[in-house]
């Protein structure tokens, strides 16, 4: 073990020294290399051309030179430049990577007429002194590419992709993995006829599994070069538009694939695991399934594939539970098999990839063992299972649907919008969205569905398709009735025309959020008033900070004050009081700062004397536990469930109305604030958890936020509380 670590550290130290020497050699030696580089685009010499751009706005594009940094954000330009660098691998590498790393594409990136015109342009050159910094930066970047391409880890990644491409070329029937023209015989397999079709194809979920495994292993074995391999993998997988966020998604340490029956889940894992074992040195793979009988065929097939492709000598079986593959340099890769009935086989192991087949059906205690590998930084868990929704115990992975980190990948032929329609039409097996995506190797038609239903009712939706109702599970049902939603949207009384008969008090609730992520939470603000037993919404805001600075509390307070100012401006008669509650759960100090700044903003507005100001501005005060001082914030604790119960009852009874003159400065002009609010309300669900059947309301579903809804619910709740003498009080004069 210590020898391996010492060897790895020695190689890293040698590469660091080589990069340092190359950087010192500068342009002179690199120019000489470029003359002998042939068609290797990475050996292109530095092209001296001047650009009228300050240095802080310059960027170095590998293979091109120093340009304006806007070129780095141009996806087409950046992808073409990197593609040309890695394309030379097919000319530079002989054997296994030849002509396989670059997918078929048109080579003409520039119109011929434009190309001819460019040849007539003479570029202004820097002087030797001016060009020195650009030249050094260029060769420094190119040296990193040289170090990447010359590393053994990169050769392994390139070889793995090239071998898998050849395997797909032969529809998984041949084994000419090294490009020598020799194909070993493979066992016969009854399959759909190809009708002369030579090259095979991958289903989208199969390609995604391949990409998840490749991206993660590349990041593990490349070390310092992991950030640069993304451009190469974008090219070989033909995904040039992938963003950095998408790349991070493929590198995350867990992912789940739920796929209908007979779609080639396990069948695809066999060549994937076998090629990974035979290509990546020192890799450790784990494979587990729900029963022992399910792991044995996979074990035998992987061993057979390895012996078929590489002979018997490098393949070694140990006790029927693991397979090791030996490389010429003495390194080994290993796969360990275990069933969920005996998870001790994977305890104490050190895996890089852990495949969990039919994961929905493994035992709960096995799940605990598997989840423990999430604590290992260089291990990725790939769950693969059927989309079973007949029982809650065999559908637990479906609970990941809608998670913020996008762990779940579901293969389905019915979208959520058309699910109910397909259930109602007994002959339908796919909706209009996905009907063209069905593979040719499955029989999914009305006759098949009817036959399945004859054996067992609902078996098609639960066992084959998935997405049906899970028996024994608490499904989230909409809490607001359709009638109440339509009434809230259509019937909007005028608070300006009817101000005389309405209450003269306004209630404001502020739910602050200190984040710049517009996909997460924002600040919700609601302004409500009373008309007898009804509540009327005067104003609503959904505010997001553009940056996290020391003035965040001031910006949130200004948003609240501007909303109130517009409410005051359109109503001629001044309100008697405005009662403000600022939630302090996330930060009590920030809540106090927001309340103070709201008071300052309203004081400024009062001195300006441009709108009718209320007689008093009061703030909700709370005394924290262990303190005798009341502070201007509201702590939301166990009141939330009761507040939502109260609001749902009032809303479904038609007692919550929106003003015809509803104010909103943050909702876009082309969007109706009431419709925007209804979108959040439709996501609200009631979830019952635990043996005590604890009820929890949540509106954060499918990536949507519920900030405006929470603010409205709490504003209605606070305006319904019995009046007390000490709950709301004014702040000291500023």
UniProtKB/Swiss-Prot annotation:
The active site is at 358 (for atpase activity), 511 (for nuclease activity), 583 (for nuclease activity), 707 (for nuclease activity). A motif (Walker B motif) lies at residues 353-358. Its EC number is 3.1.-.-. A motif (Walker A motif) lies at residues 259-266. GO terms for biological process: chromosome organization. Interacts with the terminase subunits TRM1 and TRM2. Interacts with portal protein. Belongs to the herpesviridae TRM3 protein family. Component of the molecular motor that translocates viral genomic DNA in empty capsid during DNA packaging. Forms a tripartite terminase complex together with TRM1 and TRM2 in the host cytoplasm. Once the complex reaches the host nucleus, it interacts with the capsid portal vertex. This portal forms a ring in which genomic DNA is translocated into the capsid. TRM3 carries an RNase H-like nuclease activity that plays an important role for the cleavage of concatemeric viral DNA into unit length genomes. This is Tripartite terminase subunit 3. It comes from Equine herpesvirus 1 (strain Ab4p).
